[in-house]
Amino acid sequence: AVMATDGPLLILAGAGSGKTRVLTHRTAYLIEECGVNPYNIMAITFTNKAAGEMRERIDQMVGYGSESIWVCTFHSTCVRILRRYIDRLGFGTNFTIYDSDDQKTLMKDICKRLEIDTKMYKEKMFLSAISSAKDELIDPIEFETRAAGDYVKRKQAQVYREYQQALKQNNALDFDDLIMKTVELFKLDKEVLASYQDRFRYIMVDEYQDTNTAQFELI
């Protein structure tokens, strides 16, 4: 697996069998044996802890030049890209990232403004529906189209639309937006997409089986 460097490769093995070690050794092999520039390699993980551990291992194995390799989570990868190019989607590059408390506060305001009975329709329910939609790359317009005939879904669609408008007015993204907006950017701007495709010739994803639709599309 370490020496299979051309085309896609999926590694299936049990927990603790060394899948992550394969990624770090493959990175070293690409640089030392295949002459690949570290600048052209990306390694993606799901958690900051896993990214930190992988970064440490790669630094130890590769040494000089390893700082050019992108070793980060899906979300931190997207933040780096969006900080450079999100202005092409009508946001400022100094956008704020909303945490769960910010989201709850915003949702409370929206429900109040739309006069929604939050005893019957919980704010948490709306946030969960919006998060699930974003994981599937479903924007408010498509959500509304799919909601036809279902009262609760139509209510969710209305809230989703208001929620996204409020985020944009506040120059803010929530956690799920980070991936969704990066995919949107790549679809909208072929020049930006091409620059990253040209840079990252070798992309390795740890725990790939856990990717959702948005993460899969991003890769």
Give, region by region, the residue ranges found by the protein language model.
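Conserved RecA-like helicase ATPase core segment
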Residues: K19, L23, A28-Y29, T213-I219
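Walker A/P-loop
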Residues: D6-R26
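A basic/glycine-biased coupling hinge at the interface between accessory DNA-binding modules
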Residues: D6-L9, A28-Y202, T213
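Pre-Walker A adenine-sensing motif
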Residues: A1-M3
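Conserved Walker B
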Residues: A15, F200-T211, Q215
